Amino acid sequence: MSMLGNIKTYAQTVTSLSDNDDTSIDRLNYVVTTSILIAFSLLLFAKNYVGEPMQCWTPNQFAGGWESFAESYCFIENTYFVPMQDSNLPAAETREGREMIYYQWVPFLLVIQALFFCVPRAFWIIYPSYSGLTIADMITAARQNGKQLEGADEALEQVAMINWRTEQQKGHGSRIFNCYLVMKLLILLNIVLQFFLLNSFLNTAYTFWGWGIFWDMVNGRHWQESGHFPRVSFCDINVRELGNIHHWSLQCVLMVNMFNEKIFIFLWFWFAFLLVATAGDFVIWVWRRFDSNSKLGFILDLLNQEGIDHSPQKASELYKNVLRDDGVLFLRLLDSNSGRLNSEELMKKIYNISVGHATDLNTPIEEHATSE
């Protein structure tokens, strides 16, 4: 399969990763952002390796295939920028310091960035499975069975109780919630890493690169002066002909840099938006993890149904004896992805289990199902 085919397959796989066991902010990172990066990568792959990313002005001596050879050579071996106001080319020993070494590698960088955005998601998928909990499967079961009349009670009881008591017996009531926070922290750290990666890759003098380039454009300081993503550059090429070596300095048009500039400016501001949104989301979930009033308040909201004891004492009892932090996380994710009706229905099942089998809470759910 071709490289483009592999990238397309990868993009399709990434966009199907979501199992509704996270939040919309999480999906903005590993689904939306990854899809954007893959789309830009495909665009630049097509421009660089199918179209004509560079065209060079060549002397009359370059007949036949020499022009194509020169353009391919210059694209591979880098070019260097000379401001338009400089009438002479720089000295040969200083040209290497002016070289642009990024434009050939931009599509590959975008793929690497997309992979980085998938790492936190992979951690969230893999790690909880080792403890016997699969949040995605439980939420899917609750959503599907919540729409059915036959067998809904049994399925929801299974979803409500499976592994929560096992975790309590091991003394771990917060393992999955902690794992979820680690995943969010990894997302946040990845976004910060993206800024350093862009600055290093593009070799820019600006700390806040995207804002600096944008401000230059607003103030009329374009690439001819700043040297950022220049459309015109120079390339030195040596040609051996009849035993002699001829040195040529060619002027080339880097059409692909017009795309690179717009893509990277967009990505910088997109990453800035993600940083703010993800940081805010992380703070909210840390508060939900460690603030007792937040946990009990959420449980009370779900208990506020007819025929159910929705006293603070009952909410505290359900939290300590049945749900713990992992159970609250599951209910919050179900509430976020499936709506309040499903989460209230599931809480009602949990309440009925705790009331009807209050002396049997330590019995595994399989034994409880058998005794029925």
Swiss-Prot record:
GO molecular function: gap junction channel activity; gap junction hemi-channel activity
Keywords: Cell junction, Cell membrane, Gap junction, Glycoprotein, Ion channel, Ion transport, Membrane, Transmembrane, Transmembrane helix, Transport
GO BP of this protein: calcium-mediated signaling; monoatomic ion transmembrane transport; regulation of defecation rhythm; regulation of neuromuscular synaptic transmission
Membrane spanning residue stretches: 31-51, 106-126, 181-201, 263-283
One cellular component (GO) term of this entry: plasma membrane
Domain of life (superkingdom): Eukaryota
Cell location: Cell membrane; Cell junction, Gap junction
The keyword Manganese is annotated on this UniProt entry: no
Similarity section: Belongs to the pannexin family.
Role, per record: Structural component of the gap junctions. Required for signals downstream of defecation clock.
Name of this chain's protein: Innexin-16
Organism: Caenorhabditis elegans
Taxonomic placement: Eukaryota, Metazoa, Ecdysozoa, Nematoda, Chromadorea
Gene giving rise to this polypeptide: inx-16
